[in-house]
Amino acid sequence: MKWYFYWALRQLFPAGRPFSFFALVSILGVALGVMVLLIVQSVMNGFVHDIRDSLARTNGDVRVFSSALLDDWREVAADLREREEVEAVTPFAQGIVMVQEGPRPLFPQVWGMDPATGPEVLPVDSFLVAGSLEDLDDRSVFVSTGVANRLGVGIGSDLDVYTPLMLERMKEEEVLLPLDLRVAGIFETGWNEVDRSTILVTLRTLQELYGLGDRVHGLTLRLADPEKAPVFARTLDAELPEPLFARSWMDLNEDFLFVLRLEK
């Protein structure tokens, strides 16, 4: 018998003495500590899994960006759809706007989605807590639960939307009317950063707001095997011509995922 086992047993069960209270406390203390550790680890693993799932669902598996506005995005999207790893592709544009309902202004992130191809890549319909995906058109908006609560709006409410371009022109004493959008849906993704301050409009609406013309900021991809997103993104990134580059959802949230690993 190893010497440390021998001394441990001698301390727990001294020769010639009955089972001691201290031995019982020691054994139960270790058992309780291990049990608590297992429970905490199980809860954390479930928590991390839910967050990772929310991140993947709201970001898409892989995104293709451009260091400049993407003009020929239709050709790029068609080429990507030819790859066997890719199941669906949709364009996107994004920015920051000021929205106002009555006297209350808010500055949420705005996402522009193509209603035809967006739902093939992102499960927008499953995020909706009010409204229907068919209600999203060029004169309507979906708002996150955080935006709805902070502005006190619901289905049918009207929002005045201003972009930085509009605000800049207003400084030049130009009279510009805001874009009036009707709230057609309220969504919740489970990812606080999105749910706290995000609105969703059609791609055409965002292109109009930001003066993009037919250009977009990038493409979002859904893969046949989402688990291969990091590997596929690296491979695609090496093959794409400049100024295009690819990032997986894990790359885009690398810092946050690192913090989650530390928490575990």
Stretches with model-predicted labels:
Residues 1-34:
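N-terminal Sec/SRP start-transfer signal
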Residues 13, 29, 44, 48, ...:
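Alpha-helical membrane-interface segments at transmembrane helix boundaries
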Residues 35-109, 116-119, 125-137, 146:
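Hydrophobic, regular-secondary-structure patches
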Residues 57-59, 103-108, 119, 136-138, ...:
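Extracytoplasmic
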Residues 61-65, 90, 107-112, 142, ...:
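Soluble periplasmic/extracytoplasmic beta-strand elements of cell-envelope proteins
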Residues 62, 84-90, 151, 214, ...:
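Structural motif
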Residues 93, 130-203:
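Hydrophobic secondary-structure segments that place a key small or acidic residue at a functional site
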Residues 165-167, 174-264:
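Mechanotransmission and gating elements of multispan inner-membrane complexes involved in transport
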